[in-house]
Regions:
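NAD(P)-dependent Rossmann-like dehydrogenase/reductase catalytic/cofactor-binding core
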Residues: 73-124
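C-terminal substrate-binding/catalytic lobe of Rossmann-fold NAD(P)-dependent oxidoreductases
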Residues: 3-94
């Protein structure tokens, strides 16, 4: 295995299939679902929540994205990026996702969790 040193970012290559592959959504439908997704932090408009949780790169507009250096700072590093969504020969689809490991992961994730717990009344 070869590991390349990358600062402040995690990239995941994801392969997935649907339970009913014959009726799977199209690439465009999946990208639309991602782009429109809003979680509880967005619904509550928490201070450190990204405005758009999932930033979508389409094959048409950015076929080689996400890339660490260009995607890790989106929405203050709190958004995740998805792209390169393509049909797969072994699964229904394959894709690449990227997030900032300290801003979204450790530090920012802890701050966002504290904001959520406070908003839900678990903390003062």
């Amino acid at each position: 295995m070869y590991k390349r040193q990358v600062s402040n970012g995690h990239t995941a290559a994801i392969f997935f299939s649907f339970k009913d592959s014959a009726n799977k959504p199209s690439v465009e439908e999946i990208e639309k679902m991602w782009a429109e997704y809003k979680g509880v932090p967005q619904e509550l408009n928490l201070p450190h929540a990204p405005k758009q949780f999932i930033h979508v790169y389409t094959e048409k507009d950015a076929p080689d994205q996400p890339q660490i250096k260009t995607a890790r700072e989106i929405d203050g590093g709190m958004a995740i990026s998805c792209g390169r969504l393509r049909e797969s020969t072994q699964y229904d689809y394959k894709m690449v996702s990227m997030s900032h490991n300290t801003l979204r992961g450790a530090a920012g994730g802890a701050v966002l969790l504290a904001e959520l717990l406070t908003a839900k009344g678990y903390m003062d």
